[in-house]
Amino acid sequence: MAWNSKSGSLNSSSISDDEYWSLFNFVFSESCHKTSTYKFALLKSILDNLLNNTPDENGQLIFYSDLFAKFAESFWNLVVKYHLHQQKPTGEGKTSKIEQIFNEATAKNPLLENLEFASIEENTKSKLIQKVQAECRKYVLGALYGDFGGKLYGFDQNGNFITLSQSAYEFLLKYKIELEKLNYYAWAKFLEKINEENVLFHLLSKLELSLPERTPLEIYRNILFSEFEECNCFYCGKNSAQKSMLTILFPGVL
């Protein structure tokens, strides 16, 4: 099974845009096996690091330290602020590793609950990222690798980076905005499926939203988009908070 693979060779042949779209549509669909939201977060981390890579003769390298720093940051507010579960419930009531790591950290230091991830003291943040990298990379790298048949990246658990193929890198740059929106939508659908209704009421309270006409899916989409897009624009560096406000007012934009 790909999910427990220790390494995966990169398919560096030229892949057409149509083939990549077919692969991404599969990954975003319910036909693609998912037990947690990790695949969505990993895709987001890859997209966030497209301009933070090292060219190599085999493609573009993204180091695990950068990849899982974004991975951890993506989950911080979803887990700590909104208390959203990130995997399907088990009979034993176990939560995902990312939830366990963050909940353990906030139990030891409750002050962390009120901080954005970027505001956490550097030593504490570094330790959190190291734990997330050690625990969460075990299966998600192999799982997503397998979904793409090695046509997106190659990896080695004993190494310290993934290698994007040149075809994949160019495709991701070209369609970054579209892929982000599709990723948010699929992520929101998964969150809606694995979180109970009482969590939704908690979210409405947290967001100070009294919008009975909104569907749960729209609310989860708004959370993801507002959390992840109230930041600097990928291309121009300008703050895009206005854009996220638009998506709350007009959910059809996302």
Where do the language-model regions lie?
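C-type cytochrome heme c attachment motif
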Residues: C231-Y235
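Mixed-charge, low-complexity interaction segments
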Residues: A2-E229, N239
